[in-house]
């Protein structure tokens, strides 16, 4: 059963005002509070389902355009969220020495592949390679106070560099090995040559390991 969203949830109304100045107009702010309400009250939390359940919008693409086109800044909203939570929880948080920062890389698996930056990632829990996104996340824990801080999307080297495409372009007569060890050996053979291609070099420079992403999250957490 779908639950229609006729008004923002009371808890959203109570706290969302702290973010009001980050949006250019009332309509953007309404999309923001409607989306938060959908995340809290609906079982199916997909963007399309939340849009269907919002009754005050005749155009069900409005919410999608809010995320793809409206000029609000995601990083600014998240920064405000962190500062707001730290302010609200100051009386009950433990000292820094008694608090921890958790870094996690749990996969977010998908059934289909019609998503940006999706790939087969290694699941070190069961040894499989499901189709998934692989976010690296940071989570703050201080006694009873626990909330997420931020995330970075890990993208496999072959995906972010379009490696197979460049291999086929530069080595049209070579077959790319599928076995892990043979593929790693093939990388060592062809990658130095691919790096002479300026287009490949640009993509190569965008790659970040999970450790690098985790350090970025740690540095961000320290600033707070």
Name each region found by the language model:
Residues 1-224:
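Conserved, well-structured functional cores that handle cations and Mg-NTP chemistry
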